């Protein structure tokens, strides 16, 4: 996460900083981190060079702020009312459907907004790796909490491992998102997230399990 020593700004200053980060995040999603310069961010955000220097030490600092913002975006996506607490098979299916609905608007344009950053920062320093790891840990944790509750209620068998299933959901999403972006095909992400949900469903007690629905039943919007 960004340095704790980052100076505190006024409310207006925080708003300006957040706007710059939002602009940088959008540019980095479209062009990549390496393809996004500080000058491009400054011009697009319509701020001065002194403002950039005031809010960010350098491009690395700005990139860390973008990681933090995208981490918040992931949490917000998973907080949609229809997803509840991700603690039912219906909620997990709604999660898969929500991702499929975003294929044309998001995933075919740049992949996953968080995963695309991680992919480009594989060779980054340990501090940035820590930022990215924190995001993935939090993401997995959202599913983990819901799956623990499902097992407690008896919606999953006692032998179900909530941590294993949570990691499977996030890993399936990330792999599917990458392949959908690379191939420009909706099929990989659609197949991956639906297969991950069906894997969770396979741990439901026999009396509550149902037949898997066809993976291609729901078509992406757009």
Model-derived regions, located:
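N-terminal intrinsically disordered/low-complexity leader segments
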Residues: 1-15, 206-222
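Helix-turn-helix
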Residues: 2, 19, 23, 27-61, ...
């Amino acid at each position: 996460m960004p340095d704790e020593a980052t100076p505190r700004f006024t409310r207006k200053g925080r708003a300006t900083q957040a706007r710059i980060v939002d602009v940088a995040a959008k540019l980095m999603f479209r062009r990549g981190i390496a393809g996004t310069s500080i000058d491009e961010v400054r011009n697009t955000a319509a701020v001065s060079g002194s403002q950039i220097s005031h809010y960010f030490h350098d491009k690395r600092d700005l990139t860390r702020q973008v990681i933090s913002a995208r981490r918040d975006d992931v949490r917000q996506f998973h907080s949609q009312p229809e997803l509840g607490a991700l603690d039912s098979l219906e909620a997990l299916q709604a999660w898969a459907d929500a991702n499929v609905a975003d294929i044309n608007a998001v995933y075919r344009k740049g992949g996953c907004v968080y995963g695309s950053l991680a992919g480009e920062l594989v060779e980054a320093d340990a501090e940035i790796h820590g930022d990215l790891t924190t995001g993935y840990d939090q993401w997995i944790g959202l599913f983990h909490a819901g799956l623990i509750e499902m097992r407690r209620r008896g919606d999953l068998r006692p032998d179900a491992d909530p941590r294993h299933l949570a990691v499977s959901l996030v890993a399936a999403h990330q792999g599917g998102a990458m392949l959908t972006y690379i191939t420009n095909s909706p099929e990989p992400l659609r197949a991956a997230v639906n297969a991950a949900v069906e894997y969770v469903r396979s741990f439901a007690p026999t009396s509550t399990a149902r037949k898997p629905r066809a993976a291609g039943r729901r078509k992406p919007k757009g």
